[in-house]
């Protein structure tokens, strides 16, 4: 009885519906142009750098601030 409670309720009908939904989305997609890809890459890179810069600033503040306060 415990084993049946742990097994997910997956049927062939639900799997088929999920596959059809994924295929429908894939049919609507297209390969991005080179310009579109480069734009997306630049934006993603800028976001990564921004998050890294914020993290570095927080790190520097948390390591230097106690030294400044202790003086």
Swiss-Prot record:
The keyword Cell membrane applies. GO terms for cellular component: plasma membrane. It is a single-pass membrane protein. Gene3D superfamilies: Preprotein translocase SecE subunit (1.20.5.820). The chain crosses the membrane at residues 43-63. Signal peptide: none annotated. GO terms for molecular function: protein transmembrane transporter activity. It comes from the Archaea. Disulfide bonds: none annotated. This is Protein translocase subunit SecE.
